């Protein structure tokens, strides 16, 4: 394919760029954002440059961080903590379409937040972003509890977020409730497999500390496409709710998480994101059981 040149004289060697798009198969050595900055971000920076060259039009798959988890695994809490904004909450499926979250660190004191869907850009703000996501989802997937594989893009520019792009997928549920389609499990499964099957996808599997990891449907799906776990990273939520045996769970690694585990405490009640992080740090430093977990694999930030 050789080098390619943009009209603004910005030059990238596409072959060299593609050669760097390999998943590093070594143990994870830092919490989620540090791990991202050290190992995944350089890869995705290359991806962004290649996207600017429209290489996907040539049929080349580019890496994506795909967030999966069973319903009620705490997936929304993890994403909220990373973005510092509220996402839709409630009973049933909160995420009904693929939500492409683009976080960008900004020096401006005022955050910029907008949605992109149906060929339009819709500005919003921190107070109304959850409502805006719900409204956009209704446009894409219809009102009710159905799902759609048409993506919705959420862009967030703030001074306290990591530079990070992820695709959040609906939580996995086996039993339809509250008017959900009878085949809701099959619909969500197809959507998830579509995103995690490509070898270029990095799977961020959100697991609740309160359950047996081997019974998680998200683990079963990710192991179908990544048997050795070489491109799977696990975030273990609700560590404060089930501290007994958590160290053994992440040490034994019965479910083959090749990129390692990160244990976190979910935000509780009316805590601000800053307060939640302080309490998380205190928990993992002082709890008689959780303090035994390596400090390099605890904490969302």
Curated annotation (Swiss-Prot):
Coiled coil: none
Disulfide bonds: none
PROSITE patterns, sorted: G_DYNAMIN_2
Keywords: GTP-binding, Nucleotide-binding
Region feature (G3 motif): 168-171
Residue span of region G2 motif: 94-96
Superkingdom classification of source: Eukaryota
SMART domains: DYNc
Region span, G5 motif: 270
GO annotation, cellular component aspect: cytoplasm
Residue span(s) of domain Dynamin-type G: 59-301
Chain residue ranges for the region called G1 motif: 69-76
Keyword GTP-binding: yes
InterPro entries on file: Dynamin (IPR022812), Dynamin_GTPase (IPR001401), Dynamin_N (IPR045063), Dynamin_stalk (IPR000375), G_DYNAMIN_dom (IPR030381), P-loop_NTPase (IPR027417)
Similarity section: Belongs to the TRAFAC class dynamin-like GTPase superfamily. Dynamin/Fzo/YdjA family.
Protein name (database record): Putative dynamin-related protein 4A
Organism of provenance: Arabidopsis thaliana (Mouse-ear cress)
Upper lineage: Eukaryota, Viridiplantae, Streptophyta, Embryophyta, Tracheophyta
Gene that this polypeptide is encoded by: DRP4A
């Amino acid at each position: 394919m050789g080098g390619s040149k943009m009209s603004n004289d910005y030059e990238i060697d596409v072959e060299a760029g593609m050669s760097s798009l390999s998943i590093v198969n070594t143990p994870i050595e830092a919490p989620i954002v540090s791990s991202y900055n050290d190992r995944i971000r350089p890869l995705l920076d290359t991806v962004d440059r290649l996207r600017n060259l429209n290489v996907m039009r040539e049929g080349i798959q580019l890496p994506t961080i795909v967030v999966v988890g069973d319903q009620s695994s705490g997936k929304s809490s993890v994403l909220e903590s990373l973005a510092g904004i509220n996402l839709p909450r409630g009973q049933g499926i909160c995420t009904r379409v693929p939500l492409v979250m683009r976080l960008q660190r900004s020096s401006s004191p005022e955050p910029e937040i907008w949605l992109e869907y149906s060929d339009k850009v819709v500005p919003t703000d921190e107070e109304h972003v959850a409502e805006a996501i719900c409204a956009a989802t209704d446009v894409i997937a219809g009102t009710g509890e159905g799902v759609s594989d048409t993506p919705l893009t959420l862009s967030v520019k703030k001074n306290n977020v990591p530079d990070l792009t992820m695709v959040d997928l609906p939580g996995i549920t086996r039993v339809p409730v509250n008017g959900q389609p009878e085949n809701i499990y099959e619909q969500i499964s197809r959507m998830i497999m579509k995103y995690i099957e490509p070898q270029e996808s990095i799977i961020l599997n959100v697991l609740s500390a309160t359950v047996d990891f081997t019974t998680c449907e998200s683990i079963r799906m990710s192991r179908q496409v990544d048997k050795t776990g070489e491109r799977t990273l696990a975030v273990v939520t609700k560590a404060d709710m089930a501290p007994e045996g958590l160290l053994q769970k992440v040490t034994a690694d019965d479910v083959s998480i090749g990129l390692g585990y990160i244990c976190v405490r979910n935000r509780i009640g009316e805590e601000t994101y800053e307060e939640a992080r302080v309490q998380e740090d205190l928990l993992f430093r002082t709890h008689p059981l959780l303090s035994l977990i390596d400090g390099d694999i605890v904490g969302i930030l």
